[in-house]
Amino acid sequence: MIELVQNLLTEKFSEIEFNQEKHIYKVKSDEYISVTTILKQFVPEFDIEEISKRVSKKTGVSQEQIKQEWIEAGDNGREIGTALHKYIENNVSDLPYEKPNVQGSNLELLNKKINQFDKFKQEHLTGKEIVGSEIIIYDEDYKVAGTIDCLIYDPIKNIFWFVDWKSNKKISESNKWSTLLPPLQKYENSDYVKYSLQLSIYRYIVEKKIFKNIPNSENFINNSYNVIVNFPLNEDTYKIYFTNYMKFSIQQLLNLRLKKLQ
């Protein structure tokens, strides 16, 4: 099974080029939109000026200091997240660990997250097989592309795990103050929902281009898992979320994308 899926992934997604620095996907010189860019179109804009002003009034800290702290926290989070992704990619691919260019408190936090991943691996990956890591996929009809952090096969249940690694301070599971934009207005504007939509698009593309080319694939088409694994800053262990396959909702988004292309 693993070899068949790996061969199909290579065959069906072989024509893509990815510029990591600019985060641009191209297929046969056509630029494809990323899954994250599509989803951002349905997320209310974060008004840093207005929100930092409110926080400043509430806390007594100057607005400029608050904004600067947010910028620094974002930069540090990206540095740690990039290094963690690289460690996990090498680990699950049985490649040697490359010492990251991370120093000081960020290195301390990175090592903590590495320990969290090692614990996750021990508790959840035993007996499972890694199909691939950092798998770039795309769909020619919608001209959309993205990268699956990790695809895992469970031979006992005959299902796949579509995994997204996160290193957030915390994943918001609800947001009673804000919803996504139409046609997704029934969903709260939370990390959980946005990551679930992202994984659902990845799964839909793989289902369409890979799984449907495999005989007797009904079980893993219907029963595979979409999984968010977060390695939070302020906790000692990982947190795992098995999310819904939001197939109908992402079909709505992709159909809107198709109309724009016509």
Protein language model annotation of sequence segments:
Residues 85, 148-154, 159-175, 179-180, ...:
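Conserved catalytic cores of phosphodiester-cleaving nucleases, focusing on short active-site segments
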